[in-house]
Amino acid sequence: MRAALVCLLAIIHREALRFVSQRGRFLAAIVRPLVWLIVFAAGFRAALGLSIQPPYLTYITYEIYIVPGLCGMIQLFSGMQSSLSLVYDREMGSMRLLLTSPIPRWWLLFCKLFASTIISIFQVYTFLAIAGLLGIGFSPSGYAAILPALILNGLMLGALGLLLSSTINQLENFAGVMNFVIFPMFFLSTALYPLWKMAEASTILRDICAFNPFSHGVELIRFALYGQVDWIALLWVVFAFAVFLFVSLWGYDPSRGMVRRKA
């Protein structure tokens, strides 16, 4: 038990040091959603009318609507960046040393997931603080209530990145696959538009959005900001996390997985 805790703290410390040393990564993580919030929202404010739907009790501005989606976007990019570092570590050989330690492999990978989730949560709260300074804020209780939602969403997206990293053996291939996953997952979700708005354009797109795990992660954050729980979204996120993690652990198993030659 003590060894497992030491392992967790060591990996969190390692990821934190790596994050601090990569200032450009932090800057990009904050600037990217701010550009969407300031520029994109201003352009689409008049074009996208929003009806009153849970968790909202009154009409809201488009800026308020997309904040949960931008929080999810931060965690999505953070999860993929963390997985990119896994591919790099595997190419450099440090992953082999880590995975051959006496600590169970599944715990090592979970520690990596948890560390990347903590970093993504720090980025989200930094973004929310800046958004609050721009006049787009929420209640103090809402900021506290989203923490469990951010943890679950971060773990789910981190597990997805872990799954992708278990299938890719070369660093140069990961960027293309990462973009192939990130952008469809983000745009085909409720991050930017509500489901009913998507249904007006295409029922097929609406169904894709409804089955997208990222949509449910965004809705979990959205409801949590108002002190509510979207139970369907919660079940989806937990289920997706379990599936992604299970396949990832299988992929990193040297006897059965997809990276046995590299790990």
Ranges and model annotations:
Residues A10, R14-R18, G93-T100, N169, ...:
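Short amphipathic alpha-helical coupling elements at transmembrane boundaries
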